[in-house]
């Protein structure tokens, strides 16, 4: 177990958005949580990453965490390189070699010295993902990670996810769509705050 949620509950006013959510993310796995808008997916992810305290229940994390939120949080005045240098210090990294490798995989290395203000939404999301991964976390939490991606970049994303899994890392993908199910090792469905029995997709390992 790399990440575990145990009986998580949360409410906004009288509206209960998480109702005793319990599940585990095993090592070296691609895990998906799908559900309609308003099902509680983003709230769940915010609790798992420590951004939001649950009203009830606990989480357990074994190792480093990477988090790629749905809303890209970048500074328009900074270049891509400046963002990487900032997080190099924040993560305590000796160098940026893995970050540069991620940029090559995601095909945006040519934008290294461009300011974020001139980047497209898809390229911003690539930078967001690179920042979440550049310290090689044991578990990566992704909230609708491929929004704004074209088809080629979408495929590159899944290639990267498989590479991360091959390194023994775990990836948890939150999405409102289930058409990526065949790419996942486990799939959970969140419906009105209730997490339904997971499905193990053995043939989905790619």
Put a short name on every predicted segment:
Residues 34-36:
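The feature captures the beta-strand-to-loop junction immediately N-terminal to the Walker
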Residues 85, 96-111:
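Conserved ABC ATPase "signature" region
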Residues 115-122:
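Conserved ABC ATPase signature
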């Amino acid at each position: 177990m790399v990440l575990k949620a145990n009986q998580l509950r949360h409410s906004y006013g009288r509206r209960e958005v998480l109702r005793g959510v319990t599940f585990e993310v095993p090592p070296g796995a691609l895990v998906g949580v799908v559900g309609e808008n308003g099902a509680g997916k983003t709230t769940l992810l915010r609790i798992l990453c420590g951004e939001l305290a649950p009203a009830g229940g606990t989480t357990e994390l074994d190792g480093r965490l990477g988090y790629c939120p749905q809303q890209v949080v970048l500074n328009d005045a900074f270049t891509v390189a400046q963002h990487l240098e900032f997080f190099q210090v924040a993560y305590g990294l000796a160098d940026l070699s893995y970050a540069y490798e991620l940029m090559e995989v995601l095909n945006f290395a040519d934008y290294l010295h461009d300011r974020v203000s001139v980047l497209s939404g898809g390229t911003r999301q690539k930078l967001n993902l690179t920042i979440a991964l550049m310290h090689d976390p044991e578990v990566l939490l992704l909230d609708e990670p491929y929004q704004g991606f074209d088809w080629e970049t979408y495929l590159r994303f899944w290639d990267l996810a498989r590479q991360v899994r091959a390194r023994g890392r775990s990836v948890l993908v939150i999405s409102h769509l289930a058409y990526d199910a065949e790419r996942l090792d486990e799939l959970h469905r969140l419906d009105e705050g209730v997490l339904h029995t997971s499905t193990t997709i053995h043939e989905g390992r790619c």
